[in-house]
Curated annotation (Swiss-Prot):
Organism from which the protein derives: Aspergillus fumigatus (strain ATCC MYA-4609 / CBS 101355 / FGSC A1100 / Af293)
Protein name, UniProt field: Ceramide-binding protein svf1
A biological process from GO: ER to Golgi ceramide transport
Name of one Pfam family that matches: Svf1_C
PANTHER family cross-referenced by the UniProt entry: CERAMIDE-BINDING PROTEIN SVF1-RELATED (PTHR47107:SF1), SVF1-LIKE PROTEIN YDR222W-RELATED (PTHR47107)
Length: 396
């Protein structure tokens, strides 16, 4: 009967009943025995499930010249009946004096290669190399945003637990939904995006995330926090979501820290806290103004690992009203409940620390101010200057 209720809610877009926290098998349960699993080439396959889901491959760039960029392929299936694909690109204006360069374009004649490792469409190719260590993204889908980028993994990728997936449903053997994240937290980026005005050199560092929401997004999560932190030596990632009351408002947090070419820590014992917020009149949500992120766990050799980012976020980089800006197929999935209002608050900051572990703060428009990164491995403390991209998402 619970399966039937969930199916009806998925098809009709209605709010789900209260199943309770026992109806989500969090990936944190896997991580108790297997904190993380390094990705192989086969793990990078597109799933293309034949039921309601949204599958994304998202690439974040933090260029050496300070430019922050996101490019993304979205593959969506609605009720096993209709599939759609979209290509998004966004060049952020960190000064705040001009609009961001944001394009979201439908894809036509899209397909996967026979191994489900690469994706193509008219005027678009997202290709994984033979070694499984680099993606090339080439897009002429929009003449105002010509993309030619290569992301080369410089540290191992990982999923938390055995498969990076939390499962939803009252019968663990037959889940009716899922949520998966896989990370390449540290990449070398080469290439450009060319607009009508200029060509952006995007040489620098990046992160790649493969994500699958195997159910309607507003059924899986009501809140999200995402942190992407890059320094010359370290990368840290955190993806946290809180389920709706249907699943007990359960918090699931996956993330990790890498240094150069090795994973220092990855697991599910992390936290993200909005330590201060301000009411956003347009969205009617408490937009975060300060955040504290903590990574806690063990290194491969059994040392305690503790990392922390704590401080003000500075001026908001952007507020995206998803219902106003995303294509219709995403609205159909994310907004089929009357009153659903997803908002994504995006913040880009420069981060710096130096010497001993000292708290520093910076807003995105004031790079001389600093925010503190604290990293402790065993008895050793480390700190390093870098950059952060953060998102806070609210869905009701």
């Amino acid at each position: 009967m619970n399966w039937l209720k969930s199916t009806l809610a998925s098809v009709a877009g209605t709010q789900e009943p209260i199943y309770g926290p026992e109806a989500i098998q969090s990936v944190a349960q896997q991580a108790q025995q297997t904190p993380y699993t390094e990705l192989t080439k086969d793990d990078l396959r597109w799933r293309a499930y034949q039921y309601t889901n949204v599958e994304t491959e998202t690439f974040y760039v933090m260029a050496d010249n300070g430019t922050v960029v996101m490019v993304q392929v979205i593959y969506s299936n609605i009720a096993g009946i209709h599939t759609t694909a979209q290509f998004n690109s966004k060049i952020f204006n960190l000064k705040g004096d001009q609009p961001h360069i944001w394009h979201s374009d439908p894809l036509y004649n899209f397909m996967f290669d026979e191994n489900m490792l690469s994706f193509g469409a008219d005027n678009l190719a997202l290709t994984l190399n033979e070694e499984g260590t680099a993606y090339t993204i080439k897009s002429a889908v929009n003449e105002d945003s010509l993309v030619n980028l290569t992301f080369t993994r410089t540290a191992p990728g990982f999923v938390v637990g055995k498969d990076g997936t939390s499962y939803f449903g009252t019968d663990p053997a037959n889940p009716w939904g899922s949520m998966m994240h896989a990370f390449w937290p540290r990449c070398r980026v080469e290439g450009t995006i060319t607009t009508k005005e200029k060509t952006y050199d995007l040489t620098g560092r990046g992160m790649f995330i493969h994500a699958i929401q195997g159910m309607k997004p507003h059924h899986a999560a009501a809140r999200w926090n995402f942190i992407n932190f890059q320094t010359p030596s370290y990368s840290a990632v955190m993806m946290e979501y809180t389920t709706p009351p249907s699943y007990g408002s359960t918090v699931v947090n996956v993330g990790g820290i890498v240094k150069d070419d090795e994973i220092i820590y990855a697991g599910a014992t992390n936290s993200a806290t909005h330590t201060a917020s301000a009411h956003d009149a347009d969205s009617d949500w408490p937009a975060p103004t300060s955040i504290k992120c903590v990574w806690d766990g063990k290194s491969k050799d059994g040392k305690d690992v503790h990392a922390e980012l704590d401080g003000p976020l500075g001026n908001r980089l952007d507020r995206v009203d998803v219902m106003a800006e995303v294509p219709g197929f995403v609205k159909t999935i994310a907004g089929s409940v009357a009153g659903t209002r997803p908002y994504i608050f995006q913040v880009s900051l420069s981060l710096a620390t130096g010497g001993s572990v000292v708290k520093l703060t910076i807003g995105q428009y004031s790079p001389q101010e600093k925010l503190s990164l604290k990293l402790k491995i065993g008895a050793e403390e480390f700190s390093e200057e870098g950059s952060m991209f953060s998102e806070a998402t609210f869905i009701s």
